[in-house]
Regions:
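Short acidic, glycine/proline-enriched helix-loop-strand junctions
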Residues: 301-306
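A short, hydrophobic C-terminal helix/tail in secreted or cell-surface proteins
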Residues: 313-319
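Conserved SAM/AdoMet-binding glycine-rich loop
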Residues: 14, 23, 143-266
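Anionic-ligand binding region
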Residues: 298
Length: 319
């Protein structure tokens, strides 16, 4: 649709960014000639100069077209190595989440390599942003009126392991709490097996840290968790939830689940439903499994067809 708009002159520039741009950069250039630039997962800090370059070229081409044959349009491919760490955004951030809330990305990439996930292959290994850069970015956001910081990464709880040799999220949180103007700090994407007593203690101590955790567990049954390449089991998940609610009684827990993973049986699905009922999560996101090209799970036996993914819902409607 955007390519059609470009053909009709409704767009001055068409730029494709993100994970799919990183993965299919060559195909995009070949199959969608209207695209002016492809910017990968580590090239986003260059989007403004690239846009300036493209618009300047477009303006020059329009002038040339009036007097001579226009030159062939250039194509910008900005997909640096996925193992590079993008430059600090402290002085370049544009907040698009409203005036009082902003995301603070504390790391790039992931080392977990769950069998269903393509992220490590298009975002690279786990790289923590330097703590001082994050604190500077947070200060700039606070100066701009931001009151709530939402910490994100593919996995927030191992922040610092790659560059400091330790889980430094508790330390980062403590320092963020010292920034004047920041009133709330929310933590997303905490892997269950990486949540430490130190992190729980900091959450209890610091009043600015919301009693809220997003903990993606993906499934409850040990056989499926193992096939997924997850590093925890049902008993450990139950123990963690009980511990969090004991230590922080008013904590709000959110999680995500995948249904229809290759090899999942009806019994395992029902066991997961029972698990969710017993755990009483406050927020829940449920997604049907989707085979991702290039992942181990996509090659597994027992792929479940779309018509079967919703069998239980259909049965409920008939009842």
């Amino acid at each position: 649709e955007m390519a059609e708009w470009k053909k009709k002159g409704r767009l001055k520039a068409l730029i494709v960014t993100g994970c799919m741009a990183q993965r299919y950069q060559d195909e995009i250039q070949q199959e969608i000639p209207e695209v002016d630039a492809v910017i990968g997962t580590t090239g986003y800090t260059e989007i403004v100069p690239i846009l300036d370059e493209i618009l300047a070229e477009a303006e020059a081409s329009q002038k040339e077209a009036a007097v001579e044959e226009p030159k062939e349009k250039s194509f910008v491919n900005c997909c640096p190595s996925i193992d590079l760490l993008p430059a600090s955004l402290a002085d370049k951030r544009v907040v698009t989440t409203g005036g009082y809330t902003a995301y603070l990305k504390i790391a790039e990439g992931c080392n977990k390599r769950c069998t269903y996930c393509i992220i490590p292959y298009i975002r690279g290994h786990y790289r923590s942003f330097p703590m001082e850069d994050l604190l500077e970015e947070a200060r700039k956001l606070a100066e701009g009126g931001v009151k709530e910081l939402i910490l994100i990464a593919q996995e927030t709880t191992v922040y610092g392991m790659d560059c400091y040799g330790r889980k430094a999220l508790p330390e980062l949180l403590t320092k963020l709490c010292e920034i004047e103007g920041i009133e709330w700090i929310r933590i997303l994407y905490c892997y269950p097996e990486e949540i430490t007593d130190e992190l729980i203690a900091v959450m209890k101590k610091e009043k600015k840290i919301c009693h809220y955790l997003d903990i993606p567990i993906q499934h409850s049954e040990d056989t499926i968790l193992k096939r997924m390449g997850r590093r925890t089991n049902r008993a450990e998940l139950v123990s963690l939830v009980e511990k969090l609610r004991k230590e922080i009684p008013d904590i709000v827990l959110r999680t995500t689940l995948i249904t229809g993973f290759p090899g999942e049986t009806e019994e395992e699905f029902k066991n997961m439903v029972d698990f969710v009922d017993s755990m009483e999560f406050d927020r829940l996101g449920v997604f049907p499994y989707s085979a991702e090209e290039g992942t181990k799970a996509a090659e597994m036996d027992g792929q479940i067809t779309d018509c079967l993914l919703y069998t239980s819902d259909a049965a409920d409607e008939e009842d």
